[in-house]
Regions:
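Cys-dependent protein tyrosine phosphatase-like superfamily
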Residues: 1-131, 135, 142-196
Length: 196
C-alpha cells in the first residue's frame, strides 16, 4: 500500500511457526547444516537494529536467525519475487522507502523518509529490524548517521563510521547528516529502546 509520502508498506500477518518444508520452497529455505551467510555490508548498529546491502536467497537462513519483525528498504526497485516470498513467509513488516541513490551531488536524501524511518527505529516494538539499500553504503549511511546524532555521538565518530561503509566520497552525505535536525524526530519516549 502506498501512503502520501511515497513509502510502500507491505505487511504480512502470517508468521510460519511450523517446520519448514525445504523441498516445497527451495527459494526461501536452506537445508539444516548449511552455512549462515550475512548480507553484503552487514553490521549490528545497536541491540535489535541491523544494517546491510540487499539480501539474497543465500542470506535467508542468516536473516531468519535474527527473528526480524521489520525491514526498512531504501531503493527505487521493488523486491524480487524470492525476497517478497521470504518476507511473507516470515511475517516481516516491510517499509519500502522509494529512494534514489544519493552518491551523485544532485540527489538529495528525503528528510521525511529519514524522519519516518527514525521514528520506527526508535520504537522497540519494531525490533529486531534490518535497514538496507542496494549496497548498504550511502542511503543507509545517512540514516545511521542521523540515528547516531540522536544517540549524541560526536560528528567525527559519525563520519568515521559512515566512511567505514561508504568510502571517502561523502561530502553531500556529510552535509545532510550535519544539518539534519534530530531534535525534530517525534519518537515515542515510552517505547524507546534501552540503548537510547
Amino acid at each position: 500500500m502506498d501512503n502520501e509520502k511515497g513509502t510502500v508498506i507491505i505487511t504480512s500477518h502470517h508468521r510460519n511457526q511450523t517446520n519448514h518444508h525445504y523441498d516445497t520452497c527451495p527459494i526461501c529455505y536452506t537445508r539444516p547444516g548449511m552455512p549462515l551467510v550475512p548480507p553484503l555490508n552487514f553490521a549490528m548498529i545497536a541491540s535489535g537494529v541491523y544494517r546491510s546491502g540487499h539480501p539474497n536467497k543465500q542470506n535467508f537462513a542468516f536473516l531468519r536467525k535474527l527473528g526480524l519483525k521489520t525491514i526498512m528498504y531504501f531503493a527505487m526497485e521493488d523486491y524480487p519475487p524470492e525476497m517478497q516470498h521470504f518476507v511473507e513467509q516470515e511475517g516481516i513488516e516491510v517499509l519500502h522507502y522509494k529512494t534514489e541513490g544519493n552518491k551523485e551531488p544532485f540527489i538529495e536524501v528525503n528528510h521525511e523518509d529519514i524522519s519516518h524511518a527514525l521514528v520506527k527505529l526508535l520504537d522497540k516494538r519494531s525490533h529486531p529490524v534490518l535497514i538496507h539499500c542496494l549496497k548498504g553504503k550511502h542511503r543507509i549511511g545517512c540514516l545511521v548517521g542521523c540515528l547516531r546524532k540522536i544517540q549524541r555521538w560526536s560528528m567525527t565518530s559519525i563520519f568515521d563510521e559512515y566512511r567505514k561503509f561508504a568510502g571517502t566520497k561523502v561530502l553531500a552525505d556529510q552535509e545532510f547528516i550535519e544539518t539534519f535536525n534530530h531534535d525534530q524526530v517525534p519518537y515515542d519516549y515510552e517505547h524507546r529502546p534501552g540503548w537510547l
